[in-house]
Amino acid sequence: MEEAKSQSLEEDFEGQATHTGPKGVINDWRKFKLESQDSDSIPPSKKEILRQMSSPQSRNGKDSKERVSRKMSIQEYELIHKEKEDENCLRKYRRQCMQDMHQKLSFGPRYGFVYELETGKQFLETIEKELKITTIVVHIYEDGIKGCDALNSSLTCLAAEYPIVKFCKIKASNTGAGDRFSLDVLPTLLIYKGGELISNFISVAEQFAEEFFAGDVESFLNEYGLLPEREVHVLEHTKIEEEDVE
């Protein structure tokens, strides 16, 4: 009965001259897995089949032109089938992890541009009423002050690349606390989260070269861990990971 089942599962295997190649290593591994089971429960006829499947076959001139027909045992079939199931489970698990990561980064409101705050009241409401998970970057500036225009342009670019971060700007004279933001401390960057000030940089333009751009500001903020991972990078990483699994 067992032999009849084995005959229904047939597959052709190339004869191998050595165990040093990848197929030889796989055959050795399968042999080890099968031999680790209770050998007393395997009929002699099936043992011979397993021995042939895990042992290299020598070739003469005639055999090199022919394929050697071998019978696959039920045990090896189940072993291979389990390997494929494990690979599929791993692929699904990693894909789910990547989707969860992307969902977390995409959760909450999206902005995408720099908000102009007109009054001190708007300034306070923006800080106090946003979700606690939202990072708020506020640029305190005045027209004609060195570095303010370049910083506004840089933040406009970053707002498009980090849509889950809220970028704002307000003139120092409109904050209601102009005495605290004198011209010599501009441009100033204030970063809030959960209604709390987590970082502030006065005269921030001094941290950059004479001419600076969005990439310079991005690198500066990343040094302090103030920006999340860009979504485009997450999507590219997800695609690469899925290709690696496949």
Swiss-Prot record:
Tagged with keyword NADP: no
Name of the gene this protein is made from: PDC
Modified residues (Phosphoserine): 73
Residue stretches making up the Phosducin domain: 1-244
Protein name: Phosducin
UniProt record similarity statement: Belongs to the phosducin family.
Source organism (scientific name): Homo sapiens
An example Gene Ontology molecular-function term: phospholipase inhibitor activity
Keyword Nucleus tagged: yes
Purpose of the protein: May participate in the regulation of visual phototransduction or in the integration of photoreceptor metabolism. Inhibits the transcriptional activation activity of the cone-rod homeobox CRX.
Higher taxonomy: Eukaryota, Metazoa, Chordata, Craniata, Vertebrata
Modifications after synthesis and translation: Light-induced changes in cyclic nucleotide levels modulate the phosphorylation of this protein by cAMP kinase.
Gene Ontology biological-process entries: G protein-coupled receptor signaling pathway; phototransduction; regulation of G protein-coupled receptor signaling pathway; visual perception
Composition bias type Acidic residues, residue spans: 1-14
Key words, A-Z: Cell projection, Cilium, Cytoplasm, Nucleus, Phosphoprotein, Sensory transduction, Vision
Location(s) in or outside the cell: Cytoplasm, Cytosol; Nucleus; Cell projection, Cilium, Photoreceptor outer segment; Photoreceptor inner segment
Annotated Basic and acidic residues bias: 60-69
Chief place where the protein resides: cytoplasm
